[in-house]
Amino acid sequence: LDFLPRSSVKECVTEIRTLLNEARNVDNTQKNVYWLSDKAVAYLQVELELYAGNYPAVLELTKDLETEYPESVLGADVYKYLWSSENSDARIFGKYQLEQIYMDIRFDTFEKGDYLVLSQNVDYEEEDIRKEWSEIPFVMPDAKNVRLLGKYNKMNRDKVASKYVNVARAAGMWLMRVEALARSGKEGDAVALANRMLK
């Protein structure tokens, strides 16, 4: 298909926007998180409008999603269920898995390893749920102690069953709202919201 002319970014965004608008249907309820519900399509619209720099639309769409995914779903009690076989109120859309998402991750060799090393500047408090679910103490081949980051990696290493791959979750929607606020000249509101999310 090399002979076909390439569409511009604007044309692509316009076409995707049209398709997402057509896909919206309030009757498409979220009976199961691995169904593409109306709210999951709304999440995709937020991503598209943020990419397009249409910040008023991002704020409007996230305001609509806020009724289903209020700030309260950002808490540790809800968060921990995102990486389990339990339902989570913070999961907007998740790919259903019958097997582990990763079948062969190597932590024992540098050449075949899957490394995402946390900066020493990042330090979770002991009671922070992100530490429990995301942080992996590790010794590098040069005997240096580091901390790896990766929820699915840790679940695989610890042989914890993974039922969902989280494609869209409430925290993503709220972070897109933070960015839209900041880029709309509402830096104070953006900082206040980000700080509430970090509590």
Predicted region positions:
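Structured, solvent-exposed acidic/aromatic patches
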Residues: 1-173, 183-189
